[in-house]
Amino acid sequence: MSPVISHPRSAAARHQSDELSPITITVDCPAKTNLTLEVGPAHDEWGGRHELDTTYCAIGVYDTVTATAKQPGAGFSLELEGAYLGDLASSRSDMRRNHAVLALFAMAQAAEREPDVALTITKRIPVGAGLGGGSADAAATMLAVNRLWELNWPIERLRTIAATLGADMPFCLTGGLAYGTGFGERITDIAPGSRDELALIEQGFSGEVLVGAYQSQLSTPEVYHTFDIVGAAEGDRNHLQAAAISLHPRSGQAIDAATQAGASHAFVSGSGPSVVAFAADEAAAQRIIEVWRDTAVVDRIIRAKSPEHPNISVRQ
């Protein structure tokens, strides 16, 4: 399942909307986790990024990006909202390095337009957490601008642009389930009801999804640097898990607690420190929630569904 992209209007209507579109596009984009994450060698031609073989899963924790056209020549603007902004709220944060702004600039360059767009991001996905919040914001921006400017580019063209910005962004454009290779940017979607999806369900990747989130953040480059030293622990489906736990021990404690409480799977999400636990039923989910609360091994608990997809809405 892909986000809905509307049909193009006439050239005359497009010309009128170029002057100043009254339309506001809102995109809710889900977080991502990695059901498996095998990390290979680093490649100089990829800027030092590691080769990856991963199974992506979009989970129902959503950031919301709203895009509205501004007057020609007005430039872009960015407003951040939400209770969990992390270091994005820092006065030292460079707005032009925000993933959504980079995505806007990339779309403007590809479309040969000026980035005269007002962006508002409502953050719910924890920042610096291994849940792809920045990638979700970038993907949501691309989907919004694609509709706002009536480009109507197919997902594959958007993925080509997204791949120049980051590893997870091509997946976040569609969500659901998918395999990722290369440095994570080469996406093969897993169709609903397919043999591959049924195999994941049989392996226990179904039911309730619980996210154990933290106030603290982990730097992805630091996690990879640590991985280069310590490697992957035997049996870990996420090769970055040992590195993340060495930097953030509470993640390991949360995994142990969830496993003992009956989680089908519990693991560090991506580069961490967030922990994702799958519970087969409501009773197991409640046990995990209770043990996480009682032991204080996580700072925040989020219940979610999976797999999820971006949602696009248009307001005149």
Swiss-Prot record:
<comment type="pathway">
    <text>Isoprenoid biosynthesis; isopentenyl diphosphate biosynthesis via DXP pathway; isopentenyl diphosphate from 1-deoxy-D-xylulose 5-phosphate: step 3/6.</text>
</comment>
<comment type="function">
    <text>Catalyzes the phosphorylation of the position 2 hydroxy group of 4-diphosphocytidyl-2C-methyl-D-erythritol.</text>
</comment>
<dbReference type="InterPro" id="IPR014721">
    <property type="entry name" value="Ribsml_uS5_D2-typ_fold_subgr"/>
</dbReference>
<dbReference type="GO" id="GO:0016114">
    <property type="term" value="P:terpenoid biosynthetic process"/>
</dbReference>
<dbReference type="InterPro" id="IPR006204">
    <property type="entry name" value="GHMP_kinase_N_dom"/>
</dbReference>
<feature type="binding site">
    <location>
        <begin position="126"/>
        <end position="136"/>
    </location>
    <ligand>
        <name>ATP</name>
    </ligand>
</feature>
<dbReference type="InterPro" id="IPR020568">
    <property type="entry name" value="Ribosomal_Su5_D2-typ_SF"/>
</dbReference>
<dbReference type="GO" id="GO:0019288">
    <property type="term" value="P:isopentenyl diphosphate biosynthetic process, methylerythritol 4-phosphate pathway"/>
</dbReference>
<keyword id="KW-0414">Isoprene biosynthesis</keyword>
<keyword id="KW-0067">ATP-binding</keyword>
<keyword id="KW-0808">Transferase</keyword>
<keyword id="KW-0418">Kinase</keyword>
<comment type="similarity">
    <text>Belongs to the GHMP kinase family. IspE subfamily.</text>
</comment>
<dbReference type="GO" id="GO:0050515">
    <property type="term" value="F:4-(cytidine 5'-diphospho)-2-C-methyl-D-erythritol kinase activity"/>
</dbReference>
<dbReference type="InterPro" id="IPR013750">
    <property type="entry name" value="GHMP_kinase_C_dom"/>
</dbReference>
<protein>
    <recommendedName>
        <fullName>4-diphosphocytidyl-2-C-methyl-D-erythritol kinase</fullName>
        <ecNumber>2.7.1.148</ecNumber>
    </recommendedName>
</protein>
<dbReference type="GO" id="GO:0005524">
    <property type="term" value="F:ATP binding"/>
</dbReference>
<keyword id="KW-0547">Nucleotide-binding</keyword>
<feature type="active site">
    <location>
        <position position="32"/>
    </location>
</feature>
<dbReference type="Pfam" id="PF08544">
    <property type="entry name" value="GHMP_kinases_C"/>
</dbReference>
<dbReference type="InterPro" id="IPR004424">
    <property type="entry name" value="IspE"/>
</dbReference>
<feature type="active site">
    <location>
        <position position="168"/>
    </location>
</feature>
<dbReference type="Pfam" id="PF00288">
    <property type="entry name" value="GHMP_kinases_N"/>
</dbReference>
<dbReference type="InterPro" id="IPR036554">
    <property type="entry name" value="GHMP_kinase_C_sf"/>
</dbReference>
